[in-house]
């Protein structure tokens, strides 16, 4: 059984490749000890000590999550960078799934995963505790939901879209740019039919209610 697991076919399967990229992402993002804390992280630590419904330049979700992490694990280098690294790993998984849903073969998945794993700006965002890693995850989740919706034409995905959009707004308001882009894409294509969908407007209400506090 052990030999079967370690067979070349399994070690080079699509699922195995995704696991390798996820592990690579986690290792790169969790262990850059020589850099120490980034100065913006001190700002987020201060906000997590003074929780509120919003701040001058940051919505409340990311400081709130940091407060939970610090309560559970303290304020060590590893604990502070755990969630951004996990966000990066989830982006890897979602990217693989999106490529597959859009008809990409094995080579396309490897290329896409290489890009999202080692792109310098991604590595920076996922190696420090700011809103960037969480924001990128929300963007990726919104795109994943849209790809799934267009693939299946299941209108229930609008509910999930609204939930992710609401959490994205609680992370960084610039996710509105993506929402506006999707709005235009729907308006200018045959998929404008979704504007008549009850689920789309339910999703919009959910996003508004999440963001409203």
Predicted regions and their residues:
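Short helix- or helix-capping micro-motifs
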Residues: 21-22, 112-117, 165, 169
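Short acidic/glycine- and proline-prone juxtamembrane loop motifs at membrane-interface regions
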Residues: 127-135
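Extracytoplasmic catalytic/substrate-binding loops of multi-pass membrane glycan-assembly enzymes
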Residues: 31-44, 53-68, 74-78
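Transmembrane-helix signature of polytopic, membrane-embedded enzymes
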Residues: 14, 90, 95-118, 136-137
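Perimembrane helix-loop-helix junctions
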Residues: 151, 178-208
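Transmembrane alpha-helices of multi-pass, membrane-embedded glycan-processing enzymes
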Residues: 62, 66-70, 83-94, 103, ...
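Membrane-interface alpha helices of multi-pass inner-membrane proteins
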Residues: 50, 145, 157-173, 211
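Membrane-interface transmembrane helices that cradle and orient dolichyl/undecaprenyl
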Residues: 100-103, 142-157
